[in-house]
Amino acid sequence: ARNAREFGDKAAYREKEFGIWQSWTWLEAVEQVEALALGLLSLGAEKGDHVAIAGRNRPYLYWAMLAAQSIGAVPVPIYQDAVGDEIAYVLDHCNARFIVAGDQEQVDKILDIRDSLKNLQTIIYLDPRGLRKYDHSMLKQYQSLQDEGRGARGDLGDELAKRQKAQTYDDTCVMLYTSGTTGRPKGVVLSNRNVIETSKNSSQFDDLGPGEEVLAYLPMAWVGDYTFSMGQALWTGFCVNCPESAETMMTDLREIGPTYYFAPPRVFENQLTNVMIRM
C-alpha cells in the first residue's frame, strides 16, 4: 500500500509470456493482491491458515503470498520441481488448507496425493490450459477467485481491513522449508520482523532504490528469492521481472538488463562457460 501511494504508476512487476513483456504498476499490483485476499476470505480462510504456493516465478504467485499475508494466513512456497511425495510431506506437515498451483503439472502432482491430505480444501490454479475437463469439486481458477473477491468487497472489505490492522511486527510472515538433503525438510518460520529488518539492512548496504531492475529466477521456496523478490522489492519499490522459462532466462536477462543481480557460483560458472565457448 505504501509503494502504491509513493510509486503509483511505476512498474512493480513484469512477466514475459509468449515472448512479450507484460507489466503491472504498484497500483495494479495492490488491486490484484486485494482481490485475491478477498477471494481467500470468501473460501473461509482463517488467520493462521497455511496457504501453499507451487510453481515457477510469476507475479501472480508472489501476489498469492502477499494475499495470504494480508488476511493473517501464512504462505508456504514449495519448490517447483518437488515430486509428489515431497509436496505431500510439506502440505501434511504444515496442515495446508489451500494451495495455489501455477499450472497443470503442479495440479496433477497435487491431485495424485490428495487422498493423503486430510486438511487440503481447495486447489487454486493459475494457468487453465489442460484443466477444462478436470473435476472442479476442489479446484478453483485463480482469476475467477479474484472476481469473486471483487464481488464480495462490500461484504468482506471490513474483515480484510480488520485483519490487516491486527497484524504485528512479530507475527509469522512466511514458512520456508529446507531442501531436505540431510533428512526430512524442516519448516523455517520467519516473522515480519525477520524479513523487514533483513530486507531493510541489506537494501541499505547495497544502496538499493526504486529504480533497480531485478530478475526473479531463483526458486520461490528459497529464502534468497524471498528476500530479494519479496522483501527488498517491497522495502525499496524496485521492479521484479519474471522470465518466461528457464530456457529463455539468459535472453530475458539481456532484455531486462538488471541493475541488481544475485546468483550462486554455479550460475556464474555456467555463464562464463557459455561466453568462453562462443569466443
For the regions a protein language model found, what residue spans apply to each?
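A short helix-loop-beta submotif of the ANL/AMP-binding
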Residues: 50, 56-76, 80-84, 92-98, ...
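Conserved AMP-binding/adenylation subdomain of ANL enzymes
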Residues: 196-213, 220-279
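Conserved S/T- and glycine-rich ATP-binding loop of Class I adenylate-forming
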Residues: 51, 68, 99, 172, ...
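Conserved pre-ATP/AMP-binding loop-to-beta segment of ANL
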Residues: 8-11, 124-125, 143-177, 184, ...
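Conserved AMP-binding/adenylate-forming core of the ANL superfamily
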Residues: 9-58, 62-66, 83-88, 138-146, ...
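Adenylate-forming
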Residues: 56, 99-111, 128-129, 258-279
